[in-house]
């Protein structure tokens, strides 16, 4: 009996060593994350992340941002993460402003803001945003102290959004901006039953309508990534990575205060949180075209794969938990 217990103890020890080794790999080689506590934003970078630049209103000072826990002040917030986007950002902003101003002209209750989160850009991205902010009092620049990743940029912007609805949208202009209306109509339906709701823009739900143009290799890589996404805990969503998603304000509070993954693979984590939280989630086809310069390196895909495994393991083992959090 003692011999059997000794052998069992050895097997258990080996299993724990293997699990520990796997966990160490996931924690060491994955993307940047916060592991066991609150989001990084208020804890590590309170001053630089909680202030915005708005020269049209306050030309000589940085002004404290509102947070997602304050009462909404506009109808919709467009959150735009930007890293070295000085060339592509102007076209995207022009199209977005034109659309939003048309909506405003038709409906005085349609109020908006654009928050561009400059993720430690090395080019003139911040200057481009400030040029627009000088002309429009509802365009804001939020500066990250250094490059922290797309997920961190979206997180920072959404946690300081003033809108009843919050749209994350890429700076490259790949998605037709007027498709916001499609997501808006859908989220209004979802909000009737649940204030925590998300509408995911999809490039693959309807290939013809989405006008998706991708190479064969990228399609194969996308298929492999989709399998890992399912393993991570995302079900029922065909396109998790489209940078065009609409959130209710209540959904933002829960999602972005519990987000850990800071770079490319944050989207699946948000959807895992939403599923575990039993949020209403819907997927809508949008018009999307692949933009030159928007491709991810192979090393980035490897990190994404590791992060997907990390999401799968850490949530299943309750290392990452979901709960009500505040600043």
Curated annotation (Swiss-Prot):
Residues 1-6 are lumenal. It comes from Trichomonas vaginalis (strain ATCC PRA-98 / G3). SUPFAM superfamilies: Nucleotide-diphospho-sugar transferases. This is Dolichyl-phosphate beta-glucosyltransferase ALG5D. Its EC number is 2.4.1.117. It is a single-pass membrane protein. GO terms for biological process: protein N-linked glycosylation. Pathway: Protein modification; protein glycosylation. It is an enzyme of class 2 (transferase). It comes from the Eukaryota. Keywords: Endoplasmic reticulum, Glycosyltransferase, Membrane, Signal-anchor, Transferase, Transmembrane, Transmembrane helix. Belongs to the glycosyltransferase 2 family. The chain crosses the membrane at residues 7-27. Its main location: endoplasmic reticulum. Residues 28-327 are cytoplasmic. It is found in: Endoplasmic reticulum membrane. One of its GO terms (cellular component) is endoplasmic reticulum membrane.
């Amino acid at each position: 009996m003692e011999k059997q217990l000794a052998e069992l103890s050895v097997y258990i020890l080996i299993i724990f060593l293997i699990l520990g080794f796997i966990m160490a790999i996931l924690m060491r080689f994955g993307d940047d994350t916060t592991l066991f506590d609150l989001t990084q934003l208020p804890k590590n970078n309170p001053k630089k992340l909680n202030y915005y630049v708005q020269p049209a209103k306050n030309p000589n000072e940085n002004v404290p941002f509102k947070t997602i826990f304050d009462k909404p002040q506009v109808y919709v917030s467009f959150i735009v993460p930007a890293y070295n986007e000085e060339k592509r950002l102007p076209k995207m902003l022009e199209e977005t402003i034109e659309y939003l101003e048309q909506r405003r002209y038709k409906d005085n209750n349609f109020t908006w803001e654009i928050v561009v989160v400059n993720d430690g850009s090395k080019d003139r991205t911040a200057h481009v945003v400030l040029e627009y902010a000088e002309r429009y009092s509802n365009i804001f620049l939020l500066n990250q102290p250094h490059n922290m990743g797309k997920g961190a940029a979206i997180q920072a912007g959404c946690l300081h959004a003033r809108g009843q609805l919050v749209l994350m949208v890429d700076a490259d202009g790949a998605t037709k901006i007027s498709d916001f209306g499609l997501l808006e109509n859908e989220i209004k339906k979802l909000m009737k039953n649940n204030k925590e709701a998300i509408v995911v823009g999809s490039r693959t739900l309807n290939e013809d309508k989405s006008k998706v143009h991708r190479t064969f290799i990228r399609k194969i890589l996308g298929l492999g990534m989709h399998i890992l996404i399912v393993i991570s805990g995302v079900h029922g969503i065909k396109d998790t990575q489209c940078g065009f998603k609409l959130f209710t304000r209540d959904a933002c509070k829960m999602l972005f205060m519990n987000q850990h993954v800071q770079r490319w693979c944050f989207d699946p984590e948000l959807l895992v949180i939403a599923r575990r939280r039993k949020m209403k989630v819907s997927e809508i086809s949008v018009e999307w075209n692949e933009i030159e310069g928007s491709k991810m390196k192979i090393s980035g895909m490897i990190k994404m794969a590791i992060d997907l495994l990390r999401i799968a393991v850490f949530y299943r083992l309750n290392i990452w938990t979901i709960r009500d959090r505040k600043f």
